[in-house]
Regions:
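Sec/Tat signal peptide C-region and signal peptidase I cleavage site
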Residues: 29-33
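Bacterial N-terminal signal peptides
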Residues: 16-28
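Bacterial N-terminal signal peptides that target proteins for export
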Residues: 2-19
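N-terminal pre-domain segments of enzymes
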Residues: 34-79
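Feature captures the catalytic cores and cofactor-binding loops of soluble hydro-lyases/lyases
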Residues: 73-77, 81-232, 246-294, 299-313
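Channel- or pocket-lining gating/hinge segments that regulate access to a cavity or pore
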Residues: 242-244
Length: 313
C-alpha cells in the first residue's frame, strides 16, 4: 500500500504522487512497471548510483544550481565524459529544433506510447472505467509534470496522429515545468502558436492532425529516443545540434570537465591571437614544455576564479 506522509509537498507534487498511484491501479501487479509506471522503490533501485535527493515520485533530483551550470554545456563537452565512462548511447539528433536560441535543460519525465491495438486497449479502458478513472491520454502524463521537468516522449517516430501537443498543451507544459521543455520522438501541431511560446522543444515533425491511434503504455519508465535509453530523472541538455541524456551520477563530473575544456579553448585562442605559433604548436596539447607549464598555471588560476565566483556570497 502506498502511504502519503505529512511531508511538505506542494499541491502539484501531491497531485503527481496521486496520479502515479492511480495509474498503478490500472495495471497487473506483475507487469505494471513495464506497462505503466515504476513504483518509487523501483525508480530508486534502477537509479541507485545517483548522489542527489529525490523528487516525490522517486526520480533523481539534479540540483537547480547544477542545472543552471548545464546551460553553458556544448555537445562536445558532454561527450568527452560520457564516452570515457562507457555511456556511448546518450545522444539523439535529427530533430526539428523549436526556439534553437534557447538551451534545453531539465530532469527527464518519461512517457511511452505504442501503436493502438484493440484487444490491449479494450482492457486498459475497462480497467480505467472499473477504477472510476478517465481514459489514459497524453494529458494524463502532462498533468503530472513538475517544475524543472523536461517532458520526454517516445511516440515511435509517428508523424500523422503522433502530435503529443498543440499550442494550448505546449503552453501548459511551459507553465507546469517553468519553461523546462519538450523532447518527442513524434510530432507537434499548431506550430504558429507554439512559435510564440518561449520554451525549447525538439520534435521529429509538425502535423495538423490530433494525437490518435496510439496507447499510453508507460510513465516514468525507461524509454527509447532514437538510439538512447532514457531513464526518468536523467539530466536533459539540448542545443542546436541535438539532445544529451546525462545519468545523474555523471552530472557533476561532466560539468567540472566542461570548465576545464572552456579554459583550454580560451587559452588556445589567446595563443593563436598572438600570431606566433602554428596550430600544431598549441592545439590540442602544447609541444613546448614552457608552454605546457604556462597552460597548467593558467588552468589553475582560472579554475580558482570560477569556483570563487560560484561560491555563496
Amino acid at each position: 500500500m502506498t502511504r502519503i506522509t505529512n511531508s511538505p509537498l506542494d499541491k502539484r507534487s501531491i497531485h503527481a504522487v496521486l496520479c502515479v498511484c492511480a495509474i498503478a491501479l490500472l495495471a497487473p501487479s506483475a507487469v505494471h512497471a513495464q506497462l505503466f509506471t515504476f513504483s518509487k522503490q523501483e525508480l530508486m533501485d534502477y537509479t541507485a548510483q545517483e548522489p542527489f535527493d529525490r523528487l516525490p515520485d522517486g526520480r533523481p533530483k539534479v540540483p537547480n544550481d547544477l542545472m543552471e551550470r548545464a546551460r553553458e554545456l556544448s555537445s562536445e563537452e558532454v561527450w568527452a565524459v560520457l564516452q570515457q565512462k562507457g555511456f556511448n548511447n546518450q545522444y539523439a539528433d535529427g530533430f526539428q529544433v523549436l526556439h534553437p536560441g534557447k538551451t534545453l535543460v531539465g530532469r527527464a519525465f518519461t512517457v511511452q506510447f505504442m501503436p493502438s491495438r484493440p484487444d490491449v486497449d479494450d482492457i486498459a479502458v475497462a480497467k480505467a472505467k472499473n477504477s472510476g478513472l478517465p481514459r489514459l491520454t497524453n494529458q494524463t502524463a502532462i498533468d503530472m509534470l513538475q517544475p524543472g521537468d523536461v517532458l520526454v516522449v517516445d511516440l515511435f517516430g509517428k508523424k500523422v496522429n503522433g502530435t503529443i501537443v498543440g499550442d494550448n498543451l505546449f503552453y501548459y507544459v511551459m507553465k507546469a515545468t517553468g519553461g523546462g521543455g519538450l523532447v518527442v520522438d513524434g510530432s507537434v501541431r499548431d506550430l504558429n502558436g507554439i512559435s510564440e511560446i518561449d520554451m525549447p522543444a525538439y520534435c521529429r515533425a509538425v502535423d495538423p492532425t490530433p494525437i490518435g491511434n496510439v496507447m499510453l503504455t508507460g510513465i516514468n519508465i525507461p524509454i527509447r529516443i532514437g538510439s538512447v535509453t532514457v531513464m526518468p530523472g536523467d539530466l536533459v541538455v539540448g542545443d542546436r545540434e541535438g539532445v544529451y541524456f546525462i545519468p545523474p551520477q555523471l552530472v557533476k563530473e561532466v560539468l567540472d570537465r566542461a570548465d576545464e575544456i572552456h579554459i583550454h579553448d580560451e587559452w588556445t585562442k589567446r595563443k593563436f591571437d598572438e600570431g606566433k605559433y602554428k596550430s600544431s604548436d598549441i592545439y590540442s596539447t602544447p609541444t613546448d614544455p614552457k608552454l605546457q607549464q604556462e597552460y597548467q598555471e593558467y588552468l589553475k588560476r582560472r579554475l580558482e576564479e570560477i569556483r570563487k565566483q560560484r561560491s555563496p556570497k
